[in-house]
């Protein structure tokens, strides 16, 4: 996943896009505050490596924090591109999980990148993969830059009908 992210970042810089990168492991003690960094964001890339099953604990914590503490009005205007690479199995399930979570948060998921790669050297040695990453990154850029509308989805309809989280306006520390 890091190889793919580095390539994406390279392409975005060529397009003069400001990129801020957060490694959830490095911010593990402050994950609950990260949703506040989304306030001036047009797009977000949620990237994870599936080494066994699922999206990983830190990513789940981040999404939970977006649900509990994130500004839903702001998230509603943020495009999300999932990037998932698997070393065993489950990349499609992880993309689905990230996409559905972002939809439930009210955000705008767009097509991302997912694949199975046993060894990073497979990515590095095949220029075709670089072209795929570049193309998907350019598509992501266009979607965000042109503010491409998305079709409504049932996750939003269900959320509007059956869920209502009362905002208690608690800080992360108070919520604990």
Residues covered by each model-derived region:
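N-terminal beta1-alpha1-beta2 submodule of the flavodoxin-like/Rossmannoid cofactor-binding fold
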Residues: 1-71, 131-176
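Short, glycine-/small-residue-rich phosphate/pyrophosphate-handling segment
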Residues: 76-129
